[in-house]
Amino acid sequence: MADATATNTSTTESSSSSQESYNLNDPLFLHLGENPGAVLTSQPLVGEENYSAWARSVRKSLIGKNKLGFIDGSITISSPLMNSPTAIQAWIHADNIVATWIINSVSPKLHGSIIYRDTAFEIWTELRDTFS
């Protein structure tokens, strides 16, 4: 019994220290809840008539997730933060998650214009240029 307690304590300490090694302020960090199915806004973009409210809601959600840089162009694959293969891979992963969130917050009838864009920034720019 004492051995099991010692093992559990050591496992918990190990897990805690590995979690502390993540920089939660790093825009490349993805929390477990930040998966492709996460919802950015309750109202999908349907067109010009709700673009302003939709865009504001999406921006606020992304600010809360520390991911606004993926749509405003400040966090790109060529930015100074991407200085290693690991960072580049993390950027690709995070950018694809953000792109998926945006696609999932848009009415399916509008998917044709954005589905083949490569980055979240390209998707955002296409929607902004089309509807704002």
Where are these regions (language model features)?
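N-terminal Lys/Arg-enriched interaction segments
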Residues: 1-132
